[in-house]
Amino acid sequence: MKFNEMTYTRPDIGALLARCKELAAKAAAAPDGDALVRLYYEQSEAFAEYNTAANLANIHYTCDTRDEYWKAEQDFFDANGPAVTNASVEISRAFLANPHVDVLTAKFGTTCVAGMKNAVLGMDDRTVELQQQFNALVSRYQQIYGGALVELDGKQLTIPQLGPYKEDLDPAVRRAAYEAEAGYFDAHRAELDELYGEIVKNLNAQARVMGYHDYSELSYVRMNRIGYGPEEIRKFRDQVANDVVPQLQKVMALRAKRTGIARPTFTDLPIMFKDGNPKPIPGYKARMDAARTMYHELSPETAEFIDFMQDNELFDVESRPGKMSGGYMTSLPSYKAPFIFANWNNTSGDVDVLTHECGHAFEGYVAERDPEVPADLECPGMESAEIHSMAMEFLTAPWHHLLFGRDTDKYALLHAEDSFVFLAYGCEVDEFQHIMYQNPDLTPDERNAEWLKLEKKYRPWIDFDNLPFYGRGAGWQRQLHIYECPFYYIDYCLSTMAALQFFLLSLTDHKDAWQRYLRLVRRAGMASYTELLETAGLKVPFEEGSIKGIAQQMTDWLETHQV
């Protein structure tokens, strides 16, 4: 069924909550393990209609944040979502109280029971009103960001549409693009500062109600992190600071030499090559045709997947006024259909987001068709889910010539370099958020000062050259995740560590790398991050010294593939 044929009906929340109570009672009373397993499948399916409606509403809202009907529907889910989540938690609580609960681990793997425990520990009826307030705060941020229109080159442009100007070979054009963006954020400075303060206050209040010191502690439960905690993440960040950042300084020196920009400033960083960055082929149809060929040749599984996605028009990837920034993949369970949202802006990032979101969607497509996988275990934890997407970016490399033509080698270098450099920025975002939630009384200026300190730690090569907004340390405010889903961002770093290993493996044996990836994908959400890495034969980055060798291999490859 094509996307525009999918019908939306606002769900009956009362009926759903009553059904949840019934399922919780059944779970508590299940007489044996077989009955409990059957009931787990039943409760997992019970939310399919609600989740389909919620995701349809969110797709339509983010595609046009100005549409009053879909804004009202999004408000409905913002208001009612916490009650539904809490009802789901009560079902988990009932499963955990059943003496046969260990059967679920035997059937569904280590994440099932551990995930239910996290769900119980992460939710509380006393926080429902605070959760509703948080959802409203996020919607306000999305409206500020999604409604951004700036004047440049005689045009009204969205933030994503500034992308090509930021990569222009004329430094004055680049500076003007960044200043136009900065002007918009500076104009909303007071509101953005106030919003973030309210978000920190809100989430810390939720944490304290539930007995946690602050939200940085609660987040590990809410993010369903299984098998590791704050100490492992701190060790990971330390390894990046000590073993990756020094290598990145070499990489940035190579970039400066390659571009001929002797003393690059922040607005020069998007320039990767003297003659301009790689450009993908133009045109929606041409790109989609290339994607179909690419996925048909990659594997039978991806061929079936891309046909389903394109034939059912499950993409909205072109930027336009009123459309929310960013990119995502979501699922429509009633139709067993993934959906991909993006904002193409005629830069190489268009291919990044296409292959990235297709990685998410491919895993969802495979899991939805495996009858052994319950609906709520189709996707693993977020740090693992990002492996599917980031690794797909690299594993499609043999076909990138279809999308870049003569710029293919430039894109290969840019993509590998950007992914490697990203590790530092991702750790910076994570450490910043830990500081913010552990020090909630910081003033807006003090928050910005902390960000600038972390810039020196993780990205010491950056010179902001008195650029408005960024130069005062407020650049973090354009990072959607910091407002919308705190503490998510480190997941991109953990998955990047897996993706870089897939990249290095593919250089010597692409077929083997793909088969390892498929094994990982087929475990769906029924294995933890460390188990998934072990399934694919990859190193776990929490172990001391595990990153150093990978960082050296990446630097060596980048040094020998300068274009």
Question: Can you say where each PLM-predicted feature lies in the sequence?
Answer:
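A well-structured
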Residues: 1-278
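C-terminal, non-catalytic "cap/extension" segments appended to globular domains
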Residues: 115-117, 227, 318, 354, ...
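Glycine- and acidic
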Residues: 122-123, 179-188, 228-234, 269-280, ...
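Active-site recognition of the HExxH zinc-binding catalytic motif
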Residues: 342-368, 389-390, 394, 432, ...
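Long, well-ordered alpha-helical segments
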Residues: 196-213, 251-255, 359-369, 390-407
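Auxiliary, metal-adjacent structural segments of Zn-dependent hydrolase domains
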Residues: 274-334, 347-348
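Inter-helical turn/loop segments and adjacent helix faces that build the functional surface
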Residues: 230-231, 254, 258, 298-301, ...
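Post-HExxH zinc-binding segment in Zn-dependent metallohydrolases
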Residues: 242-243, 367-368, 379-407, 415-416, ...
